[in-house]
Amino acid sequence: MKHKGQKIQSFICHFYLIILTIIAIFPLVWIILSSIKGKGELTGNPTGFLPKTFTLEYFRHVIFDLGFINNIKNSAGIALVTTLIAIIVAALAAYGIVRFFPKFGSVMSKVLVTTYIFPPILLAIPYSIVMAKAGLVNTRIGLIIVYLSFSIPYAVWLLVGFFKSVPIGIEEAARIDGANKIKVFGTVVLPLVAPGIVATAIYTF
C-alpha cells in the first residue's frame, strides 16, 4: 500500500513538472514557429500555431539588411577588450590587496561588492553627462569604459578569494630560489589561480 502511494506521488510530481515544462517552453516554440511563417499568414492568422507556409525571409532581413553581423562583431570586440583589461587590472589589484594590504583589503573587498547594491540605471544620467562632456558618446572607447566600471569591482572581489587560497609558503619558497615579486606573481601564483581567472573572465564577458 505504501509502495502504491509512492507511485501515485511520483506520478503527480512528474505530471506537474511536465505541465510546467510545457508552459515554460510554449512561448519560445510559438515564437520560433511564427518566425518561419509567411507574411500573409502571420498577419492574417497571428494566433495560428503551426505554419502553413515556410520562409526564412525574416532571418535574411535581420542578418543581412539590418547589419546584424556587424553588430555582433562590434559587441564581441568590445566584450573581448573589456574582459582582457578587466582581468589584468583585477588580477593585479586582487593580488596586491591580498599580499600587501590584507587588513585594508578585507574592507576594500566589501566596499567593492556593495557597489552592486545600486541598480545600474541610477548611473545612466551621470554616465551620459560625463561621456557627453568627454566626447565619448556613441564610441567604442566610451562603451569599454562604462563596462569596465561595472566589471572590475566584481572581478576584484572574486579574485581576492582565489588569491587568498594560494599558500604564502609557496611564494616564499620561490623567493628563496631567487625569484622576484613579478616572477613569483607571473610564474607561481597566476597558474595556481588560473581556474578562478577563467571563471571571472567568463562572468566579465
Mark where each language-model region is.
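A structural signal for multi-pass alpha-helical bundles of membrane permease subunits
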Residues: 2-205
